[in-house]
Amino acid sequence: MKTLVLLSALILLAFQVQADPIQNTDEETKTEEQPGKEDQAVSVSFGDPEGSSLQEESLRDLVCYCRTRGCKRRERMNGTCRKGHLIYTLCCR
């Protein structure tokens, strides 16, 4: 199960890297200076739509956040997120 979560986090990271265009340095500094923009929600679903053993209630919706300061109380670090040239911590619960 941990392998599946890690693999899903890496796939999400790959999609995010491909989706985000490379930003100029000026735009990155503006992003860094804006408070409250540090957390981004990501929803992960496991299994196929027909149903499988992986679609248990606890694994159906894994909510992940890209955080700058580390994970919160009930979250675990599952990798990293990248937006432009900035690297964040991927925290899931």
From Swiss-Prot:
Q: Which residues form a coiled coil?
A: none
Q: Where is the sequence biased in composition, kind Basic and acidic residues?
A: 27-40
Range of residues in the leader sequence:
1-19
Q: Where in the cell is it found?
A: Secreted
Which pairs of positions does the record mark as disulfide bonds?
C64-C92, C66-C81, C71-C91
- GO cellular component, as recorded: extracellular space
Propeptide segments, given as residue ranges? 20-58
The processes (GO biological process) annotated in the record are: defense response to bacterium
Region labeled Disordered — which residues?
A: 24-54
Swiss-Prot/TrEMBL keywords: Antibiotic, Antimicrobial, Defensin, Disulfide bond, Secreted, Signal
Q: Which InterPro entries match?
A: Alpha-defensin, Alpha-defensin_C, Alpha-defensin_N, Beta/alpha-defensin_C
Q: Chief subcellular site?
A: secreted
> Record's family?
Belongs to the alpha-defensin family.
Sum up the protein's function in the record's words. Answer: May have microbicidal activities.
Protein name as catalogued: Alpha-defensin 23
Species source reads Mus musculus
